[in-house]
Amino acid sequence: MNFFESIINFFKSLFWKQEMELTLVGLQGSGKTTLVNVISNGGFIEDTIPTIGFNMKKVTKGNVTIKLWDIGGQPRFRSMWERYCRGVNAIVFVVDSADREKFEQSKQALQDLINKPPLAKIPLLVVANKNDLPNSAGVDEMIQNLDLRGIVGREVCCYSISAKNSVNIDITLDWLIKHSSSVKN
């Protein structure tokens, strides 16, 4: 980006609000709803119930209004994932980094989703949630277990977070807001 583009983008950010849409998917119990609650309410809510179908929340962070689609992770709702991922600015795939027995199932669910032609080129953010728990996998291990280096044709990023303790939520939001100007399909 050259100097003049930077100045133009700065003035745009002052006068025009940006909107972005994100879809959060992942296996049940991975922490999708907790993450949405932390982003929208600024803190952890103890009694989070599993999402049946989907929930949507709008949140404003700075000059960006974010529409967050939280889709249920139970097997019966996974067929809905593609529909809610079409045309979004980014897909957020949430993984319980402490539940190692489900890594292979998470990998398969992720591959099934991102291999859908309508979702080509949509940026993917993988969040390895629950890093506050013992034996949780770090970023490098998550990248390896989910074969994230094998994903081509889209930007892919992975962060280790704790939605419960608000660890790395800021860098996660920064990455997502950076992609708010991504072209929607």
Swiss-Prot record:
The keyword GTP-binding applies. Pfam families: Arf (PF00025). GO terms for molecular function: GTP binding; GTPase activity. One of its GO terms (cellular component) is lysosomal membrane. Gene3D superfamilies: P-loop containing nucleotide triphosphate hydrolases. Keywords: GTP-binding, Nucleotide-binding. It comes from the Eukaryota. GO terms for biological process: protein transport. InterPro entries: Arl8a/8b, P-loop_NTPase, Small_GTP-bd, Small_GTPase_ARF/SAR. GTP binds at residues 28-34, 70-74, 129-132. Belongs to the small GTPase superfamily. Arf family. This is ADP-ribosylation factor-like protein 8. It comes from Dictyostelium discoideum (Social amoeba). The lineage of its organism: Eukaryota, Amoebozoa, Evosea, Eumycetozoa, Dictyostelia. The gene is arl8.
